[in-house]
Amino acid sequence: MRCLKAVVAFFTALPVGGAELDFSCIWATPYLAGLMVGGAGGAVYFLTHSPAAAYAALLLATGLHHLDGLADVGDALMVRDRERARRVLEDPRRGVGGIFAVVALFVLAASARPESWLDYIVTDLYSKALALVVAAYSKPFKEGLGSLFIVSAKRQWPAALPALAVAAWLHPAAFLAATVLSLFFYVAAYKHLGGANGDLLGALLEVTRALYLATVDLSTSLINGLF
């Protein structure tokens, strides 16, 4: 129970009293935190039919934690030197790269109109599952929460496969496109930084989620146009 509380405390904005840092149940991230965060977005979409409001609910449900990682990585990618780029990750000030990354991602996800409110749950299951699998094959460039996550993921990543299978079964074209584009982003940033940390994994979560929503919308529109 303690490790499950830690998953909720780390990946959502829900107040969890007495939660301690414990990644021994990191396998549950897609199914526990994913359902909670995705459920928040899905509920808002069901009530309002507004993609922007639904995506904002997703972000607020995470406490904007991963969005901050995306902004940090966006700034770091603007710096060519690896050591300077790593230092930029720790800088709380925002540069043009971080601002652009956040705005572009919000516009992409907020303009996507999925088939159903359930797609918000699926996209969060998928994004967290993909991050878990990718982390298992990554190397941290520094000690911290990211390195602890990576070490735990190396033992537990197979548990994420059912969540990926659900996303692939429901929207195969969107799954393929979002996965390829997300991995392209991750590999480019990983090589630039010489490894991974919590910011990069958080950025991957946000990028994957937005891309899946956008590609679900696009693939659905194309299929409806053809038939």
UniProtKB/Swiss-Prot annotation:
It comes from the Archaea. This is Adenosylcobinamide-GDP ribazoletransferase. GO terms for biological process: cobalamin biosynthetic process. Pathway: Cofactor biosynthesis; adenosylcobalamin biosynthesis; adenosylcobalamin from cob(II)yrinate a,c-diamide: step 7/7. Belongs to the CobS family. Its EC number is 2.7.8.26. InterPro entries: CobS (IPR003805). Signal peptide: none annotated. GO terms for cellular component: plasma membrane. It is found in: Cell membrane. Its cofactor is Mg(2+). GO terms for molecular function: adenosylcobinamide-GDP ribazoletransferase activity; cobalamin 5'-phosphate synthase activity. The keyword ATP-binding does not apply. It is a multi-pass membrane protein. Keywords: Cell membrane, Cobalamin biosynthesis, Magnesium, Membrane, Transferase, Transmembrane, Transmembrane helix. Joins adenosylcobinamide-GDP and alpha-ribazole to generate adenosylcobalamin (Ado-cobalamin). Also synthesizes adenosylcobalamin 5'-phosphate from adenosylcobinamide-GDP and alpha-ribazole 5'-phosphate.
